């Protein structure tokens, strides 16, 4: 299925039903009084995050979503039925924006998370509400209120722990195939990957992490060149980026260092926060470098690239070095989660009563 990561839709909640201005008319009841019921509430439009859905393609074609109107009230104290709500199921990771103001309405990050996108209109009042000691036969009633309608922009940002970053044909798809259950298209030409691929990497019975492979970047991606700029947003939720570099390009005129610097430059131009994310260097295709030249090739790259962070040497094709990379990632993610758990368990110092005790003698 084609990956669709953005869509625009219109949601229209149902109008409330009108109240009734009916009078009770029965044999032997000459002054029956008002018996007009209220109108029913209009149906609302809801969104719910569903982990079994991984695309917004349904909303690319179905752009208008309407809930039912509430029914009108009737005589004999009959209230109108409420309009049925409708629920729009969206992938986990969908950000919902107001298309007119670009205000972020919600971020669906948890499976089952539920949100009202458009509230149904309230039903109108029947004339039974207007009866008083001075007005025994009221003819007043109110109409139902209109339901909300909104133009929305849906944007899907995949939820992954690790993001793969690199030039086209750097071997990212081969790497995600080697370490995970993902099976993207692989070929020996650039731009094989046309949409993000997610893979689950299992490192133990109860341990795993998710890797995202996005289309390769080229210079000028931040301004819209190539395909990768459309998907850079998917890296914003990751915890660590793997910068995959082809250390043995077929075209000998291509300088891997210059390409790596171009990628870093695109990151910086696109989003400073993304640029500051933890980033590891993964030097790929070492199987294409003669064994006696590998050490010198790696040292030369690291020196010219002026890289100070973690470096992993791998061959995604032969799986050489991939297991060490996987275990290093899992260890890093475990440490991050342990730190987050410790921070969440720490008491809030603002609520510690001992911090608010004041020694009045010292103040004197």
Curated annotation (Swiss-Prot):
Residues 349-364 have a biased composition (Basic and acidic residues). Residues 160-334 form the OBG-type G domain. One of its GO terms (cellular component) is cytoplasm. Its main location: cytoplasm. Residues 128-147, 340-364 are annotated as: Disordered. Its EC number is 3.6.5.-. Mg(2+) binds at residues 173, 193. Keywords: Cytoplasm, GTP-binding, Hydrolase, Magnesium, Metal-binding, Nucleotide-binding. It is found in: Cytoplasm. InterPro entries: G_OBG, GTP-bd, GTP-bd_Obg/CgtA, GTP1-OBG_CS, GTP1_OBG_dom, GTP1_OBG_dom_sf, OBG_GTPase, P-loop_NTPase. Pfam families: GTP1_OBG, MMR_HSR1. An essential GTPase which binds GTP, GDP and possibly (p)ppGpp with moderate affinity, with high nucleotide exchange rates and a fairly low GTP hydrolysis rate. Plays a role in control of the cell cycle, stress response, ribosome biogenesis and in those bacteria that undergo differentiation, in morphogenesis control. Monomer. NCBIfam families: Obg_CgtA (TIGR02729), PRK12296.1 (NF008954), PRK12297.1 (NF008955), PRK12299.1 (NF008956). This is GTPase Obg.
